[in-house]
Amino acid sequence: MAPRLVLASQSPRRRELLGQLGLALDVRPADTDERVLPGEPPRDYVLRVAREKARAVPGEVVLAADTAVVLGGEVLGKPRDAEDARRMLRALSGTRHEVLTGVCVRRNASALGVELDAVVATEVAFARLGDAEIDWYVGTGEPLDKAGAYAIQGSGGAFVQEVRGSVSNVVGLPLAETAALLRRAGFPLPWEQP
């Protein structure tokens, strides 16, 4: 029998996405500092945070991820408050931006262990938003705990005009790439088990 996968995240979206793969999960959120370091490139940032989360949580097989919206080289994490969400949405309005997710799988099955990771990028084109749309959306509360202040799988999806790449990446976890990392780490996926 395969070990249960430990998800080092409190994100309900990641839990739901992994549920789509039929994986049994133990959820153990990692307590890590998610601030961007001065001069840290966005790809390095999401990978560093994902690795730190995976290393902070015990378990035989641990999966961690970190997602950021990137506009003009600036990492847009979760907004601090409603005004910060408005600022982010104004900045994203009418632009193309990138959503990056760093994914790390750590397996402690041997003395050496295995750590595999990847960064997945998805390009998103956002509609032009007026103040009324932004105020309404912020008023729903939905953007307040989302990287970049929007949820493609929620009401924020109405503002997305085009997606190039993994849609599940924009939600918070690139499923195809995550399944490939788990497989490479020797973690059997449900359809591979006898």
Swiss-Prot record:
Record localization: Cytoplasm
S-S pairs: none
Catalysed reaction, written as an equation: dTTP + H2O = dTMP + diphosphate + H(+); UTP + H2O = UMP + diphosphate + H(+)
InterPro entries associated with the record: ITPase-like_fam, Maf-like
Domain of life of the organism encoding this protein: Bacteria
Site (Important for substrate specificity): R13, T67, Q153
Main subcellular location of this protein, as a coarse class: cytoplasm
Keyword Cytoplasm in annotation: yes
Catalytic residues in the record: D66
EC number: 3.6.1.9
GO molecular function: dTTP diphosphatase activity; UTP diphosphatase activity
GO cellular component terms listed in the entry, alphabetical order: cytoplasm
GO terms for biological process, alphabetical: nucleotide metabolic process
Protein keywords: Cytoplasm, Hydrolase, Nucleotide metabolism
Cofactor: a divalent metal cation
NCBIfam families, A to Z: maf
Family: Belongs to the Maf family. YhdE subfamily.
Record function comment: Nucleoside triphosphate pyrophosphatase that hydrolyzes dTTP and UTP. May have a dual role in cell division arrest and in preventing the incorporation of modified nucleotides into cellular nucleic acids.
Name used for this protein in its record: dTTP/UTP pyrophosphatase
Source species taxonomy: Bacteria, Pseudomonadati, Myxococcota, Myxococcia, Myxococcales
